[in-house]
C-alpha cells in the first residue's frame, strides 16, 4: 500500500502524535532532537520499525488503517522511543531499561514490547506442520527452508521435529 492510499487525516494524526511526543521528550530531556523521517513502508506483521542510522520510523499502513487509534497512541511513541534512546544513550538493548524509562517517564506511554492487533489481513499463506502435541503453521519462508534442507523446526512444547502434513 502506498502512502497516497492512506487517508490524509490519518497521516496528519500520526504527525501530530509524533511531534507532540518529540516536543515532550525534548522539553523533559533538555534537548532539541530533530524530527525523524517518517514513511509508511513497513510490511508483514510488524506494526513499525525504527531505523537508527537513517533516523527513520517506518509504519505498517495496513495495520495503521485497521487500528488507527491504538496504533497512533502506542506504536508511534514506541518507535520514537527507540530513536530517542539511541540519540540519548547510544546503542543499548532494544527494549531494555533505557527504552522502558523513555516510554514511561519521558513519553508517558505504557512500555509494551509487542502490539495486540489482529494480523489476519497482513499474514501471508502458511503451511501446516505437525508434532506429537499440536498443529503448527509455518510461514512461506520457513517452509521453503525446510524444503531446501536448510532448517529444521521443533515444537517449543514437546521438542519434536515439525513434519509437513
From Swiss-Prot:
The active site is at residue 79. Residues 20-163 form the SprT-like domain. It is found in: Cytoplasm. One of its GO terms (cellular component) is cytoplasm. It comes from the Bacteria. Its cofactor is Zn(2+). GO terms for molecular function: zinc ion binding. Binds 1 zinc ion. HAMAP family: SprT (MF_00746). This is Protein SprT.
